[in-house]
Amino acid sequence: EGPFGDHLGYYSLQHDFPLMKVHKVYARKNAIWAFTVVGRPPQEDTSFGQLIHSMTGAAVSNEIPGLKAVHAVDAAGVHPLLLAIGSERYTPYLQTQKPAEILTIANHILGTGQLSLAKFLWITAEDTSAKFKLDTHKEQAFFAYMLARMDFSRDLHFYTNTTIDTLDYSGENLNSGSKLVLAAYGEVKRILAAIVPDSIQNLNQVEVVNSISP
C-alpha cells in the first residue's frame, strides 16, 4: 500500500499492510460530516482531537496516577506533541526541586495506548506557589514556563531504538526510532528574552531575525 497522503500532510512510502475487503459502507442521512479530509492541520485530526479531549480529559488522572493534565497539540498534528502537568511528591522535604516523579509519569504516558505515539513529551509539575495556574492548552505560556526552568544538561531524556508511529519516518526502520521527553521543574534558571539581542542581529550569517515568543 502507498504512497498515500497521511494525517501530517506528507506522503507515506510503500509498505506491506494487511488486506481488508470492504463489502458495505454505511452513512447516516443528513450527516454533519459526510466525509473527512486528512492533511496538514487543521484537518481530520483536529476535530477528533478536540472530541477526545472533551471526552477523556477528566479520566486521564484516574488512568495515570499523578498526572493532572495532558494536551495533544493540534498544530503538531495532534499526537506527535504532548504537553503534560504532573505531580512532584517524592522529596517535598528537600530545598532543591528537580524532576523525579514526573519522570515516572512520563514513562507511564509513553506506555499508554495512543499516547505512546507521541514523538515529543513536555512535562512539568503542578506549581501551587505560582501566581498563575499553568494550563497545557495555553501553549505559549506553557513553553515559556518550562524553558525558564529547564536544565539542558539534565532535563532532556532520549528514548532510542523504541517503537514509534508508523507515519514517522525519522527512524532507521518502519515503526522504530526515537522519542524525546523534556521534563523541567523547580526554580527559574533564566529570564527569556522579549526582544532579539543585538549580538544576534549583527551576525554576518543572519539577515532577518524576529521573535515570536514570549
Predicted regions and their residues:
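Charged, compositionally biased interaction regions
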Residues: 1-214
